Amino acid sequence: PTTSSISEWSSSSYGIDPEAHRRFWQLMNDVIAAAFACDTCRVVSMRVTDIFSGFEGDWHQEVAHEAHFPEGGKQAIIAAAHQRFFRDVFLDLVAKLDAIDETEGTVLDHALVQWTQESGAVTHDPIELPIVTAGSAAGHFATGRYVDYRNLNSVGHTPNETNAVATNTGLIYNQWLGMVLRSMGLSPSDYESGAYGGYGIVQLATEGWYAGYQKYGPSVLSAMGQDLP
């Protein structure tokens, strides 16, 4: 790299400049690719708070909290931002990892890259949480697939005057995370907590406005320690 991420981040217009966001995170991708190639690091977690948009208002309250509203304008804004991130950051990292040759493939072939959101279709709610992956973790995962784990007979949300989204519950995110950890050589005893499998705490009693894991039946909860079908 010939530029500095600090120079990008310190610009007064950085917060609403998606091109600056792209340049900043592509520099981070350079660091990640170099670290993986040198085997100085094997796990990276990218918590991206940049909005990848020129929206000048309160992104949290005026976009993220209103993306499921019937008028649809905020959904278009957040969808465009996600598309920019996918194109400019996720695919950039994947390409850089795939360009580094290793024995029997590339760094990407031996890695798993995951991109997801903190919310599903409705803000603060993990139902219908989309996940995009690249790499097979050295053959542990089949690639080139689209998999839908929703149960279309199990309703998560129904549309109303303040919500345009109809959702369905399905298998639980914790189950996927446990499968990822096992693909990296961990055993369930390394990460499981409580009576259920998968990675992460299961809290059956939650706030009144969100029923949490109560939206899932016992057959789904009991399968959390298994590989996804």
Enumerate the language-model features and the residues they cover:
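Ligand-binding pockets and gating/stacking loops
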Residues: 1-229
